[in-house]
């Protein structure tokens, strides 16, 4: 039986996103589902009802009709009590739920015998789950938008300029927290020309900050900040004191501070105190991306932009929604990947398989039974390294060298003598043309070995352009063999049928390598073009 996927209008305040977009509707229909969208659901993201109709969806007039008919409901925000009341008993809900923060909502959904997949509970340590990771998608959009909001509230350029009217210094941006949102903010601010500094409790993100054009500011306190599931952990009091001292110093120098620090299931840590705000330069800006969880700044007002001590503090809780079309497109794609995992048979039905670690982590309620929190994922245990073999007491005289040791001078001399004798015999009895070809063959083997095997493995892909050049040399050699003789003297040395066949084969294989290599290289370079 084909299931109906319903997409309601989001009722949360200032929420403009929609759980699916017309392009994704077409893909859901190809999976065998029917799709219904509430009228006006996509208006905030600039998707009209006609766009959904064109994609094949049914447009439903009322929320009650949509919730009552839908087998699967796709949402962005957690459902309200009124929406839970409309949810059909035994149906499936997919979207943000935040089970740790919403225990009452969990009880209401369980009472409906619903199956609930919380996109925020996805195990982010699973590499194959990245395609479903809506938290990362929304955090990237929010980090970008945070810089845009900061630029709007800031009274100067981001980049430095020298004009006839005088010199304009670049803005100094400090980003607290270098997760997905923080890295997006760093890249955006650096792209606008600002001087960007950033800090995070996880020291391993320093290279990522530098790669985006920022400077990593380290806290003068030794403590590892990585927590489970790819998140940061709560730090010790000693670390927090050292961190506050560093933040106080940065606040005096920064023009813009963007805070992104969050700890799952807990209120946002207070990083920026009122005293730090007071020490900032007039006209400075703070964008607190943790406003929905209480804020990283003591003076943040969630959902509003306020001015305190001459500093604008932006506490908007709908940063991703302020880029509604982009956010909706990314979020809809994430949910599509979830549906694809649930509907591997592509028959318009779903199977919530608890043997799948990603689906097990997503599922917080199954048929009315609360299954959250999920059991920890069993990480594969690395095989123990084999014990080192005992070092031989003496080198083996039979081979001239021990294990891993270079050849002795005597053995090396013998090898060269044998090689010279072989060349002498070849030169004595083989025709002159064979000797010339054989010499070129030996040199080609040597050059090929030096070119390929002496290159670091990580550079093999960039080496593709060099192999294309070498392939062209081989192609020219094959063409010389295949080409007709230019005179009677040359006709006498024309290669036999076997040599011609080998030359044609070499030319064919080389052409495949050349054209294929250039095609792949072109695709690689296209990834870096804007």
Please report, for each region that a protein language model flagged, where it lies by residue.
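Adenosine-phosphate binding glycine-rich loop
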Residues: 3, 120-121, 126-163, 170, ...
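Glycine-rich phosphate/diphosphate-binding loop of Rossmann-like nucleotide-binding domains
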Residues: 8-47, 159-250, 407, 425-427
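Hydrophobic alpha-helical transmembrane segments in multi-pass integral membrane proteins
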Residues: 474-490
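Cytoplasmic-side transmembrane-helix entry/capping segments in multi-pass membrane proteins
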Residues: 438-441, 461-472
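Rossmann-fold NAD(P)-binding glycine/threonine-rich loop
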Residues: 100-128, 266-318
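Structural signature of hydrophobic alpha-helical transmembrane segments
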Residues: 432-445
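Structural/interface elements that position substrates and couple domains in central-metabolism enzymes
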Residues: 2-111, 118-149, 153-160, 166-169, ...
């Amino acid at each position: 039986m084909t299931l109906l996927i319903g997409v309601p209008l989001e009722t949360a305040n200032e929420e403009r996103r929609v759980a699916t977009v017309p392009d994704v509707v077409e893909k859901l229909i190809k999976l065998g589902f029917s799709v219904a969208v509430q009228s006006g659901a996509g208006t905030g993201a600039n998707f009209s009802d006609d766009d959904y109709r064109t994609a094949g969806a049914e447009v439903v007039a009322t929320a009650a009709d949509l919730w009552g008919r839908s087998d699967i409901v796709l949402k962005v925000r957690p459902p309200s009590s009124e929406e839970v009341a409309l949810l059909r008993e035994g149906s499936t809900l997919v979207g943000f739920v935040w089970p740790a923060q919403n225990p009452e909502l969990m009880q209401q959904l369980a009472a409906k015998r619903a199956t609930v997949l919380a996109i925020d509970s996805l195990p982010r340590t699973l590499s194959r789950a990245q395609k479903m990771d809506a938290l990362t998608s929304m955090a990237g959009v929010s980090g970008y938008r945070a810089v845009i909001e900061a630029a709007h509230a800031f009274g100067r350029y981001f980049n430095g300029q020298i004009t006839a009217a005088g010199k304009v210094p670049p803005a100094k941006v400090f980003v607290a927290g270098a997760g997905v949102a923080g890295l997006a903010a760093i890249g955006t601010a650096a792209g606008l020309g600002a001087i960007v500094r950033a800090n995070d409790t996880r020291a391993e993100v320093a290279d990522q900050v530098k790669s985006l054009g920022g400077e990593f500011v380290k806290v003068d306190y030794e403590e590892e900040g990585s927590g489970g599931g790819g998140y940061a952990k709560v730090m010790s009091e000693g670390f927090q004191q050292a961190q506050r001292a560093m933040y106080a110093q940065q606040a005096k120098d920064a023009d813009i501070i963007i805070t992104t620090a969050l700890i799952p299931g807990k209120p946002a840590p207070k990083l920026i105190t009122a005293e730090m705000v007071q020490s900032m330069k007039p006209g400075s800006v703070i964008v607190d991306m943790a406003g929905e969880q209480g804020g990283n700044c003591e003076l943040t007002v969630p959902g509003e932009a306020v001015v305190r001590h001459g500093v604008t503090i932006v506490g908007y809780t709908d940063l991703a929604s302020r880029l509604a079309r982009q956010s909706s497109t990314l979020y809809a794609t994430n949910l599509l990947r979830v549906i694809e995992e649930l509907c591997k048979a592509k028959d318009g039905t779903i199977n919530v398989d608890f043997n799948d670690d990603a689906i097990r982590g997503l599922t917080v309620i199954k048929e009315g039974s609360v299954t959250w929190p999920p059991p920890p994922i069993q990480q594969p245990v690395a095989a123990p390294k084999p014990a080192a073999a005992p070092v031989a007491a003496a080198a083996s005289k039979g081979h001239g060298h021990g294990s891993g040791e270079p050849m002795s001078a005597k053995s090396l001399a013998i090898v060269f003598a044998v090689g010279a004798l072989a060349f002498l015999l070849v030169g004595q009895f083989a025709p002159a043309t064979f000797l010339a070809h054989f010499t070129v063959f030996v040199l080609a083997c040597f050059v090929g070995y030096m070119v390929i095997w002496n290159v670091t493995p990580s550079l093999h892909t960039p080496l593709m352009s060099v192999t294309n050049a070498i392939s062209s040399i081989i192609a020219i050699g094959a063409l010389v063999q295949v080409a007709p003789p230019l005179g009677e003297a040359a006709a006498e040395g024309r290669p036999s049928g076997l040599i011609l066949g080998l030359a044609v084969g070499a030319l064919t294989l080389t052409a495949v390598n050349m054209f294929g290599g250039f095609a792949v290289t072109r695709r690689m370079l296209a990834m870096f073009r804007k």
